Curated annotation (Swiss-Prot):
E.C. number: 2.7.1.48
Enzyme class: transferase
Pathway it works in: Pyrimidine metabolism; CTP biosynthesis via salvage pathway; CTP from cytidine: step 1/3; Pyrimidine metabolism; UMP biosynthesis via salvage pathway; UMP from uridine: step 1/1
GO biological process, one term: UMP salvage
Stated name of the protein: Uridine kinase
Gene: udk
GO cellular component: cytoplasm
CDD domains, per database record: UMPK
Catalytic activities: uridine + ATP = UMP + ADP + H(+); cytidine + ATP = CMP + ADP + H(+)
Keyword tags: ATP-binding, Cytoplasm, Kinase, Nucleotide-binding, Transferase
Subcellular location: Cytoplasm
Organism for this UniProt entry: Shewanella amazonensis (strain ATCC BAA-1098 / SB2B)
Length: 212
């Protein structure tokens, strides 16, 4: 598989802005056209840096909304390998242990790779690897309420810890890093992951790139 046959789409935006939902929708709908083995989804969260050498007390203090928390170098390396036709081992990250697990997830080369993550557009090397980029422009108060519900229900967090993290790092880092990265997006999507028109536009763009 050569680089022209691998279309990489990056979907960025605030935590709980609808990135995973629109990525899932596009994945499922393109799978019907291309087959499940031709499309892959990679979450930026899998590339949080390994913290196994730190105590749990130290891990919970990490600023997970700062670009330095991400191993973007490894992600870029994996994307280049996939474009060159090689399989990669994607890290598995634990939200409860706040570090990588020993397991990995094998991804084989795909025709379409959908990236989703809060800080994707802050890295120029990742932007250079993308064929199209998206920013989910969902109001921050809505994102916070979604995040609060999700993290308590799915990630073993307390309500107090989620609120504290939002005040200390999530909102400040959004304003400092994530929101400014919107300028690099090819498509800006309002109203969250259920925006049908935006989904159709993005699918059409992917299909156009595949037809080249």
């Amino acid at each position: 598989m050569n680089s022209q046959q691998c279309v990489i789409i990056g979907i960025a935006g605030a935590s709980a802005s609808g990135k995973s939902l629109i990525a899932k929708t596009i994945y499922e709908e393109l799978c019907r056209d291309l087959g499940t083995d031709q499309i892959g989804v990679i979450a930026e969260d899998a590339y949080y840096r390994d913290q196994s050498h730190l105590s749990m007390e130290e891990r919970v203090k990490t600023n997970y909304d700062h670009p330095k928390a991400m191993d973007h170098e490894l992600l870029a390396q994996h994307l280049r390998s996939l474009k060159e036709g090689d399989s990669v081992e994607i890290p598995v990250y634990s939200y409860t242990e706040h570090t990588r697990m020993s397991d990995t997830r094998t991804m084989t080369p795909k025709k379409v790779i959908i990236l989703e993550g809060i800080l994707l557009l802050t890295d120029p090397h990742l932007r250079d690897l993308m064929d199209a980029s998206v920013f989910m422009d969902t109001p921050l108060d809505i994102c916070f309420l979604r995040r609060l519900t999700r993290d308590v229900a799915e990630r073993g967090r307390t309500m107090e810890s989620v609120i504290s993290q939002y005040q200390k790092t999530v909102r400040p880092m959004f304003l400092q890093f994530i929101e400014p990265s919107k300028q690099y997006a090819d498509i800006i999507v309002p109203r969250g992951g259920k925006n049908r028109i935006a989904t159709d536009i993005l699918k059409a763009r992917i299909q156009h790139l595949l037809a080249k």
